[in-house]
Structure formats: structure tokens, C-alpha cells
């Protein structure tokens, strides 16, 4: 894998959290591991490094022909643990409180299983074009919101891993605009949340277009 594709996967995973995304609560902050983290920039950096370190393992799980591995709840939780386990004690643990996004905590196991079973069916029967399958998988998992935080980053990476497992290039998730200043970043966040909200009414067209932009 080229350095540029590797970088796109990392940035895509840690990329823009949408406006209206799940805030970090005091309960979450109690689980912060690095003692030197004092600012959002510090947190972004340690999370970025953690995700980068998790990528080699994640990519091995998603080698071409191994898509079935991704449709397992245990994989989703293990991926989140590896992405954030150096930063948060609760990494890889199920969300226990209600949030502004996601199903109630007691419904997470069933909703997650249903989302992954549907994705497996789409894959095995090639129900949709490949980009739409990946976008739908991301959208469904975000809708479950299984973790206290990091759901968007984890589920974007899962979508990219699925694409890799079938020999398709990963989504770019508008990474070309992430270094264009604060206003451009706000525009990216607005476009991302708008695309999530538009699905499935628009047949996921906006989400696929954003993911490939």
C-alpha cells in the first residue's frame, strides 16, 4: 500500500466530526489515559497516532476476499479498542448513556447485529453498487452509535476496510479540503452531516458523493 493511501485512511478515520456529533462528556474524560493532554489539539494528536498504529492490524483483517470478517460485532469492538485504546480506558466498550445520536444503549447489541447482517447480505448478493454498500454500512453503524465517542471515525474506517476487502479504493472523505483553513473545515463538516441526514431518502447519493470527494 502506498504512503498516500495509508495517509488517506488515517485522515479519513480521524477526519471531520459533524456538527451535532457526540460531545465528550465529563464521564468520558475520566477515562483519558495520557496525562499530558491539555487541549483539543493534544487530544487530536494522540488519537491520530493511536489510529495510525491500529491501521496495520486493521488492514490485515480486510485483505481482499476477507469481507466476511468485517460483519462481526466482535470485530467492530476490537477495531475501536485498537484505534483508541492508548487514549481512552473505555475504548472498545459499549456506550452506556443516551446520546444525541444513536439508539438507546439497551438496543445497541441487536441494532448492531442487524446492521452487520444487512451489510453481509448486501455483500453476498451484490444488492447495490460497491460504493453504495460501503456508504450504507457506514450510515447504519453511525445510526447505532455503539461507542461513547469515536463512532464516526471508527465506522468511516470500517467502510474503507470493506472497500479494500473487495479490491476497491478507499473513500477520500473530502480529505483534500481538510488543510484549507477553518472555514473550509466547517464546510466539510456541514456537508458530511447533511449527507448523513439526506440518506436514505436520496438513495445515499449525497453520502457517496461526499465520501468520494
Where are these regions (language model features)?
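FIC/Doc superfamily catalytic core
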Residues: 1-213
